[in-house]
Regions:
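Hydrophobic core of transmembrane alpha-helices in multi-pass small-molecule transporters
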Residues: 23, 91, 103-119, 304-321
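Short amphipathic helix-loop junctions that connect adjacent transmembrane helices
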Residues: 34-50, 231-248, 330-332
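Intracellular juxtamembrane helix-capping segments at the cytosolic ends
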Residues: 36, 118-131, 321-335
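Helix-to-loop junctions at the C-terminal end of transmembrane segments
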Residues: 64-77, 162, 262-275, 366-367
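Cytoplasmic membrane-interface "Motif A"-like loop-to-helix N-cap segments
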Residues: 73-86, 272-285
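C-terminal ends and interior cores of transmembrane alpha-helices
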Residues: 86-100, 285-302
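Glycine-rich segments within core transmembrane alpha-helices of 12-TM secondary carriers
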Residues: 141-159, 348-358
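C-terminal membrane-cytosol helix-exit motif in multi-pass small-molecule transporters
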Residues: 158, 162, 180-198, 388-392
């Protein structure tokens, strides 16, 4: 294992504590994600539109990420990574302690999301910077795989716990507290990363450059399509099919296993065939996924359509791994690691510009017109994303 990692990462970077921290943060996220939808539906009593409103506020930190990172422009990527972890911890502690008020719970989710989004930009940046030349795709695949393994462990704990113990507000808060403790472990590991990354030459961590226009627009369409499944996919299973926390965590676990096993392969595929081919082809599968998720119940009995929707959710998670290709695309266009870091961070905020409105409008569309319309729109957005990705001109040949 050590030799395999050494073949991917540069010798002069602290990739071991970085990967350790990612694993623990993944585990904490697994506990959080495994119970969140059921907590909001069963304890906080949020409906379709309420869930969209909560997601709207959860995504706002992503939109503000550029400004947040600009404030920290003097800090290294490693230090920002740690700051994100501390903010995540604050939000998780709040979730474990506050009453089940829609407003207060939404604020806690928003705080956790701020830390999560700060880390997201730095994870992409560090994954590319720490990699040896020509290994960026494999590096992104490895770190995604490790994060998913930690997430899987969190899901497994929730699956077993809610099979044995009764569901309720106290039970949910207990696991939010456990997740907080695990984040503390991750913060401790991240302190060993030091602050070795170079500062941006122009003292900025964000900017818009003409050569990245296609990347920014692709992030908009990808963010919109992703948001539909991330927010409303699981909530459909909870509200419409009555799936409990144990069932949802098991589904998330299966999804995490598939992503963990396949993400390194997707990374290799990006390095071998090129990011453009991967960015274009994933949407063809997405159309099938959206059709069955939105219309399965029209063709099959409820129990069968539930299983089909679960399978489609897992398949969507797998094809979402192709988003790693956009980070390699940015590296291909960039003149320096600093430019890569700034562009990826900006891309996260561009992604969320449309995402927050999809979250808000998605709940309304579901409530007024039905789930079929929502997933039809998602499929159309995906096709637009694929068509635009086909116009990309690559400047480097795929690795042989």
């Amino acid at each position: 294992m050590k030799n395999r990692l050494s073949g991917i990462y540069r010798d002069d970077v602290p990739f071991k504590p970085y990967l350790t921290a990612l694993f623990t943060f993944g585990m904490a996220y697994g506990l959080y994600k495994g119970i969140l939808d059921n907590y909001l539906a069963e304890v906080v009593a949020m409906g379709e539109f309420d869930r969209g409103i909560a997601e709207f506020f959860r995504e706002i930190p992503g939109l503000l990420l550029v400004g947040v990172l600009a404030i920290m422009y003097r800090f290294s990527a490693e230090k920002i990574f740690r700051i994100g972890a501390v903010v995540m911890l604050a939000g998780m502690v709040m979730l474990s302690a506050v009453p089940a008020s829609r407003v207060i719970v939404t604020i806690a989710i928003c705080i956790y999301s701020l830390g999560e989004h700060i880390q997201l930009g730095m994870r992409n940046t560090l994954g590319v910077q720490y990699a040896k030349p020509g290994k960026s795709g494999l590096s992104m695949g490895k770190q995604t795989s490790l994060y998913d393994l930690g997430t899987l462990l969190g899901f497994a704990v929730i699956t077993v716990a809610f099979l044995i113990l009764p569901s309720g507000g106290t039970m949910f808060r207990l696991f939010f507290a456990v997740s907080s403790a695990i984040i503390v472990v991750g913060v401790t590991a991240s302190t060993r990363m030091g602050s070795g990354s170079r500062n941006d030459a122009d003292k900025r961590r964000f900017y818009f450059r003409k050569k990245f226009t296609k990347y920014y627009l692709l992030e908009v369409t990808y963010g919109a399509r992703k948001q539909v499944f991330f927010t409303f996919g699981p909530y459909l299973l909870v509200l419409h099919y009555g799936a409990g926390a144990s069932v949802m965590s098991l589904l998330f676990a299966v999804s995490a296993i598939c992503c963990s096993l396949l993400s390194p392969l997707v990374g290799k595929l990006i390095d071998r065939v090129g990011y453009k081919a991967v960015m274009v082809s994933d949407t063809l599968i997405l159309v099938v996924v959206c059709f069955f998720y939105g219309f399965a119940e029209h063709f099959f009995p409820t129990n069968v359509s539930f299983v089909i929707c679960c399978c489609m959710y897992v398949l969507d998670s797998v094809i979402s791994l192709a988003s790693m290709a956009s980070n390699v695309y940015v590296q291909d266009l960039s003149d320096s690691p600093e430019e890569t870091r700034a562009t990826i961070a900006t891309g996260v905020s561009v992604n969320h510009f449309v995402t927050i409105f999809v979250a808000l409008l998605g709940g309304w569309v579901w409530k007024i017109t039905g789930i079929e319309t929502l997933f039809t729109i998602s499929a159309v957005i995906g096709l637009l994303n694929s068509a635009y990705a086909a116009t990309i001109k690559t400047s480097k040949s795929p690795a042989k």
